[in-house]
Curated annotation (Swiss-Prot):
Organism this protein belongs to: Chlorobium phaeovibrioides (strain DSM 265 / 1930)
Pfam short name (any one): Arginosuc_synth
Keywords noted in UniProt: Amino-acid biosynthesis, Arginine biosynthesis, ATP-binding, Cytoplasm, Ligase, Nucleotide-binding
First-level EC class: ligase
InterPro entries to which the protein is assigned, alphabetical: Arginosuc_syn_C, Arginosuc_syn_N, Arginosuc_synth, Arginosuc_synth_CS, Arginosuc_synth_type_1_subfam, AS_cat/multimer_dom_body, Rossmann-like_a/b/a_fold
Classification via HAMAP family: Arg_succ_synth_type1
Official protein name in the record: Argininosuccinate synthase
E.C. number: 6.3.4.5
Record flagged with keyword Cell membrane: no
Annotated positions binding L-citrulline: Y87, N123, R127, S176, S185, E261, Y273
Binding, ATP: A9, Y10, S11, G12, G13, L14, D15, T16, S17, G117
PANTHER family linked: ARGININOSUCCINATE SYNTHASE
CDD domains membership: ASS
Length: 400
């Protein structure tokens, strides 16, 4: 009888390294290890050798960077999706793509089960499993961290040593870190106290604003229909744009975020994020929208941005609601074409200028000089009609 096969989201860390052996023993199944590359900087060489030596029957490395930028990041940027007005959703955006890649490999490898290494109190378990349910509803999902016998990192290390599983014996960082090209999330350790300022060693890529260059960096970003297409006049692929802005913004201390956020599972958590490129691009994109979108569209889209952010954060990317919102967002982005000039300086992003062939700013209407073309006399009748409802109400209900 052929063994069942389990597709495992594999990072090469302690949890997923011992998970291969644990899953094989518990389910008598072969384990297919899958790693997705979303632009993380951590070492990915040697993962295949490590996975196979640990007991995986096969290993799949899937390069997802281009798809991540074009089909996920740009959609979120166009929508203006910032969870609770702060978080650019780097980790949350990556999870549905990783889960989809897992399902694709699982089907190719004839797997009947999907496994992940998410904890039982975090958001990622929801994101993975809701995506699995959307794309592979008949596959069984395994979450070893919710059921296995290990209660500490030390007990996991003991298991690894007992079964000759190669794991790092260097001092573990006190922080839990997740990284991709759109940003880095940092939690745990002293960061769990919301009154403790993040130690400098918690940050992975950004320069401290105090130590950033004394000379500001000026950068120009061009957009076409809401999507960045060039930096400082140089046309670039999306991946290169993000890499370039990560470099420029990080060295100027831009992109450090500290927030208390509401998790999917009902608790509040303190999160530190580094998102240099995301911070710059969201700022620039929003300013270009101010210039080009009609008032009611601009204001209504701010509500949609929160709905879109919640969809990403809550793990319902593969939903009809997200598809429907994409249609609205794409229509709003047709005039969001132009250039935004910014100054990056010691942790701050400052707007220096913006222009667009679809600008709704009319200087002749806005000016207070003799070039003013606004009909001032029209204001009197407008104000009478605009305030008529309140005037009528006040006549019936006099102010006390």
């Amino acid at each position: 009888m052929q063994k069942e096969r389990i597709a495992l989201a594999y990072s090469g860390g302690l949890d997923t390294s011992i998970m291969i052996k644990w899953l094989k023993d518990k389910y008598g199944a072969d384990v297919v290890a899958i790693t997705g590359n979303l632009g993380q900087q951590k070492e990915i060489e040697g993962l295949e050798e490590k996975a196979v030596s640990t007991g995986a029957s096969s290993f799949h490395f899937v390069d997802l960077k281009k798809q991540f930028v074009e089909d996920y990041i740009w959609r979120a940027l166009k929508a203006g999706a910032l969870y609770e007005d702060v978080y650019p959703l780097a980790t949350a955006l990556g999870r549905p793509l990783l889960a989809k890649a897992m399902v694709d490999v699982a089907l190719e490898e004839n797997c009947t089960m999907l496994a992940h290494g998410c904890t039982g109190k975090g958001n990622d378990q929801v994101r993975f499993e809701v995506t699995f349910a959307s794309l592979a509803p008949n596959m069984k999902v395994l979450a070893p961290l919710r059921e296995w016998e290990f209660t500490s990192r030390e007990s996991e290390m003991d298991y690894a040593i007992k079964h000759n599983i190669p794991v790092s014996v260097t001092k573990k960082s006190p922080y839990s870190i997740d990284e991709n090209i759109w940003g880095i999330s940092i939690e745990c350790g002293v960061l769990e106290d919301p009154m403790v300022a993040p130690p400098e060693d918690a940050y992975q890529i950004t320069t401290s604003p105090e130590n950033a260059p004394d000379t500001p960096t000026v950068v120009e970003i061009e957009f076409v229909q809401g999507v960045p297409v060039s930096v400082d006049g140089k046309k670039m692929a999306g991946l290169d744009i993000i890499n370039r802005l990560n470099e420029l913004a990080a060295k100027n201390g831009v992109g450090r975020l500290d927030m208390i956020e509401n998790r999917v599972v009902g608790i509040k958590s303190r999160e530190i994020y580094e998102a240099p490129a995301a911070t710059v691009l969201h700022f620039a994109h929003r300013e270009l929208e101010r210039l080009t979108l009609e008032k009611s569209v601009f204001q209504y889209k701010r509500h949609i941005a929160q709905d879109y952010a919640n969809i990403i954060y809550n793990g319902t990317w593969f939903s009809p609601m997200r598809t429907a919102l994409d249609a609205f967002v794409d229509d709003t982005q047709k005039p969001v074409t132009g250039m935004v000039r910014l100054k990056l300086y010691k942790g701050n992003v400052t707007l220096l200028g913006r222009q667009s062939p679809y600008s709704l700013y009319n200087e002749a209407l806005a000016t207070y000089t003799e070039a003013d073309s606004f009909d001032h006399k029209a204001a009197e009748g407008f104000i009478q009609l605009y305030g008529l409802g309140l005037k009528t109400y006040s006549e019936v209900h006099p102010a006390k």
